[in-house]
């Protein structure tokens, strides 16, 4: 719908007029004619030229003195044009030009006037010759006498003033024009125009800021409500997975739409929902869907918007937010990244009473204080529920705390299906397989996988998104883009291949509940290669044997290097593997109770969110117990490392096969790994199968024409495929018969030769 243009306000018109006035004044000052300057020698030459001129083409219209500014101002006729200029001269020169008699005129000047010129005794007479003929000496004398009379009236009675006294007193003496005097406009109004315009502009600016202040914002009221009222087009159908979370929030939305239904049953709806969980799981998306479903005023604000420069701003913004929400009740308030103001009180820089705590205290009062908040639903979202203040989490404020966790395999498939809409994906790809290969991925990461695969399809100019592009997209999300141009020596490349093959052999043979899905020696990020090991089934608990097998798999790379190159030639490539193995071993001893020390938790999470997570970790046990913990961790790592060495030595042939295949292909996948394990032979050249560049037409037709039409069309495609397969079988049989015939003929020929 076309929006109506907003009518300009009176203040806008005033601002435009002020700006036009300033611009006009600047242009007037810039374009107004100004007197130029000439030197005294040039002026003397012009005086002589005009004095000896026999025509009226060169003469002075005006020749005036301004002793107070030491200026001689001239208006001169030069041919067909009139020039105006001024000359800077000291009082001595000016008095010389003014004097009627006296003064020395050089012979050079007199010779330049010519013999036909009248005899002159002063510069004043020469200037008279150079002026217009009608300006006689009598007119000039009367002008001087008038100046004298004006001076006498100023001095007072009983005083005598002579002509020479007036000249020496630096009073202006004008030959044929008076010194110009400005009128009232130019003398009193024009000089003050810039000041008036700037004053008007300042008044207008102050007026506008005051208006903003009255409206609740601007410079004079920084405590304005920063919340944004949004209208979202998202629905719960746009949120894949998180069925339980959507069910909980849908109950709140239904209450806002039908409060009487719950009031009749005597039910009190919870006042707030806290959405927690890892990043990228859809907390903000759920809030957008809630805004789209509720059809009530929805106020969105980030918690960081409350606390800014001025003291007390945060508390005031909280009051303004709830005041506006109460005025439009029923309403929803969504505060994103709540931990920015909701952290536990009593800690932090500035002691226990800083600006953030004032804001939190005001939020606690507004959520459940003396003023009733009936009809207001508060939704908070954060990734750090562990650092929130306990008073914020109690019933009556956030009654329900919902963890939006990482999606399971079924939810991942739903999320992939949602993001795959409108994308041309190869028919050979199933979203279920992608979901299996992406355990631990959040919804944001799954969306990124589909988007990266689409970008790769556009880059490579393929008709559909292929399985290879999906693989590359998953790798990009996990480790970043491949560094194909990295220069690496053949020896180092071989060592990396042995390292990754060692991981794979241990992971395959120990049966730790994971499958080696992919091995690559293509460098990505800070790694020279990696193994993608995924669990066979979705599990939320791990056994001791599985953890030990995982540690052994991590140590497999270092074990392979030691077996092939010796202890003195092992590389730094196992640094990250050792770090991960050590973390698992430490947790087995200190948290899981899987050691000889018994089922005791030695490391409690007493860490401070302000001083660092590991600051107080080792404060709950003695140094002797710490030494015993280190011994147990060392024992777990050492035994797992020995197990990895024994496994690789037992299956040395598989290690060499995987290494050779990696050097040849750089990347091998699960099916190829399985074939190497089962046959213990190199892969045949024909295992590289090109994927069909075929669009999954059924999904597209189902979206456009309906499921019945899509099913019928698919059946027709299947019949065509069966007919094509029959033709191929007939051709194959004919080819076989031809081959048999050729074989028999060759046998006959060979027998003949014998």
Swiss-Prot record:
It holds the Pfam family AAA_lid_3. Gene3D superfamilies: 1.10.8.60, P-loop containing nucleotide triphosphate hydrolases (3.40.50.300), Peptidase M41 (1.20.58.760). It is a multi-pass membrane protein. Disulfide bonds: none annotated. The active site is at residue 500. Signal peptide: none annotated. Acts as a processive, ATP-dependent zinc metallopeptidase for both cytoplasmic and membrane proteins. Plays a role in the quality control of integral membrane proteins. NCBIfam families: FtsH_fam. This is ATP-dependent zinc metalloprotease FtsH. It comes from Mesomycoplasma conjunctivae (strain ATCC 25834 / NCTC 10147 / HRC/581) (Mycoplasma conjunctivae). The gene is ftsH.
């Amino acid at each position: 719908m076309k929006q109506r243009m907003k009518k300009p306000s009176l203040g806008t018109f005033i601002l435009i007029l002020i700006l036009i006035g300033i611009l006009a004044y600047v242009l007037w000052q810039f374009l107004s004619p100004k007197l130029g300057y000439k030197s005294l020698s040039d002026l003397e030459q012009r005086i002589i030229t005009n004095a000896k001129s026999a025509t009226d083409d060169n003469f002075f219209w005006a020749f005036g003195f301004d002793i107070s500014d030491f200026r001689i101002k001239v208006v001169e006729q030069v041919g067909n044009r009139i020039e105006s200029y001024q000359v800077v001269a000291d009082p001595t020169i000016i008095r010389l030009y003014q004097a009627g008699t006296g003064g020395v005129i050089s012979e050079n000047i007199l010779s330049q006037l010519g013999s036909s010129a009248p005899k002159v005794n002063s510069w004043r007479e020469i200037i008279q010759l150079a002026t217009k003929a009608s300006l006689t000496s009598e007119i000039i004398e009367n002008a001087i006498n008038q100046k004298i009379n004006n001076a006498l009236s100023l001095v007072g009675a009983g005083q005598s003033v002579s002509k020479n006294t007036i000249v020496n007193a630096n009073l202006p003496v004008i030959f044929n024009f008076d010194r110009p005097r400005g009128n009232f406009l130019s003398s009193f109004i024009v000089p003050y125009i810039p000041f008036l315009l700037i004053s008007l502009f300042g008044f207008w600016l102050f007026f506008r800021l005051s208006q903003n202040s009255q409206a609740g914002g601007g410079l004079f009221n920084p405590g304005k409500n920063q919340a944004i009222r949004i209208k979202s087009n998202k629905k719960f159908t746009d949120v894949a997975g998180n069925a339980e979370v959507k069910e909980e929030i849908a109950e709140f939305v239904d209450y806002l739409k039908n409060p009487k239904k719950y009031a009749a049953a005597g039910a009190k709806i919870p006042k707030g929902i806290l959405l927690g969980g890892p990043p990228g799981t859809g907390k903000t998306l759920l809030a957008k869907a809630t805004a789209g479903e509720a059809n009530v005023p929805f106020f969105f604000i980030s918690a960081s918007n409350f606390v800014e420069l001025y003291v007390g701003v945060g508390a005031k913004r909280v009051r303004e937010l709830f005041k506006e929400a109460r005025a439009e009740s029923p309403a929803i308030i969504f505060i994103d990244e709540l931990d920015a103001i909701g952290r536990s009180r009593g800690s932090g820089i500035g002691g226990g009473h800083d600006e953030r705590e004032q804001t939190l205290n005001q939020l606690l009062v507004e959520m459940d204080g003396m003023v009733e908040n009936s009809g207001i639903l508060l939704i908070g979202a954060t990734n750090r529920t562990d650092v929130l203040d306990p008073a914020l989490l109690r019933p009556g404020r956030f009654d329900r705390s919902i963890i939006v966790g990482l999606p399971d395999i079924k939810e991942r498939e739903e999320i992939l299906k949602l993001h795959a809409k409108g994308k041309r994906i190869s028919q050979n790809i199933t979203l279920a397989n992608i979901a299996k290969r992406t355990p631990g991925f959040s919804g944001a990461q799954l969306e990124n996988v589909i988007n990266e695969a689409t970008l790769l399809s556009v880059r490579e100019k393929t008709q559909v998104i292929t399985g290879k592009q999906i693989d590359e997209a998953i790798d990009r999300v996990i480790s970043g883009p491949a560094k194909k141009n990295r220069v690496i020596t053949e020896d180092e490349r071989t060592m990396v291949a042995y390292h990754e093959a060692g991981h794979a052999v241990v992971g395959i043979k120990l049966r730790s509940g994971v499958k080696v899905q992919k091995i690559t020696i293509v460098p990505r990020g800070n790694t020279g290669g990696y193994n993608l090991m995924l669990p066979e089934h979705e599990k939320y608990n791990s056994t001791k044997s599985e953890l030990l097998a995982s540690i052994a798999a991590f140590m497999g790379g270092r074990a392979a290097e030691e077996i092939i190159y010796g202890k003195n030639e092992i590389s730094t490539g196992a640094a990250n593997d050792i770090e991960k193995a050590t973390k698992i071993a430490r947790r087995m001893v200190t948290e899981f109770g899987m050691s000889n020390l018994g089922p005791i938790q030695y490391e409690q999470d007493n860490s401070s969110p302000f001083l660092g997570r590991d600051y107080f970790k080792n404060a709950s046990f003695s140094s002797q117990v710490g030494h015993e913990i280190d011994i147990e961790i060392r024992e777990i790592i050492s035994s797992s490392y020995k197990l990895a060495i024994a496994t690789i030595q037992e299956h040395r042939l598989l290690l060499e096969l995987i290494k050779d295949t990696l050097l040849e292909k750089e990347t091998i996948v699960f099916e190829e790994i399985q074939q190497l394990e089962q046959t213990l032979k190199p892969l045949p050249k024909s295992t590289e199968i090109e994927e069909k560049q075929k669009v999954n037409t059924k999904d597209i037709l189902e979206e456009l024409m309906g499921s019945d039409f899509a099913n019928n069309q698919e059946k027709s495609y299947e019949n065509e495929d069966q007919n094509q397969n029959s033709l191929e079988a007939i051709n194959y049989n004919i080819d076989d018969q031809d081959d048999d015939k050729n074989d028999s003929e060759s046998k006959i020929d060979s027998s003949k030769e014998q």
